[in-house]
Amino acid sequence: MKTQLAFLAITVILMQLFAQTEAGFWGKLWEGVKNAIGKRGLRNVDQIADLFDSGLSDADDLFDSGLSDADAKFMKMFM
């Protein structure tokens, strides 16, 4: 009985340590996904895709697809 109680206590402690470690990892991973897929992240991906899209249709000419100076500086940081 004492062995079972000690085994249970050790198991609970190890599970708590594992859960806290996993929570930190999954939390950081989820935050990165939210930043990449969030409104601003998707908008930036769309603007970058427009830069490399050579076959624009007439409908695309109706919308402003140019980059602002701030966007150009932001992209230069990564190059």
UniProtKB/Swiss-Prot annotation:
Residues 41-79 form a propeptide. GO terms for biological process: defense response to bacterium; killing of cells of another organism. Keywords: Amidation, Antibiotic, Antimicrobial, Cleavage on pair of basic residues, Cytolysis, Hemolysis, Membrane, Secreted, Signal, Target cell membrane, Target membrane, Transmembrane. The modification Isoleucine amide is found at I37. Expressed by the venom gland. It is found in: Secreted; Target cell membrane. GO terms for cellular component: extracellular region; membrane; other organism cell membrane. Residues 1-23 form the signal peptide. Belongs to the non-disulfide-bridged peptide (NDBP) superfamily. Short antimicrobial peptide (group 4) family. This is Antimicrobial peptide UyCT1.
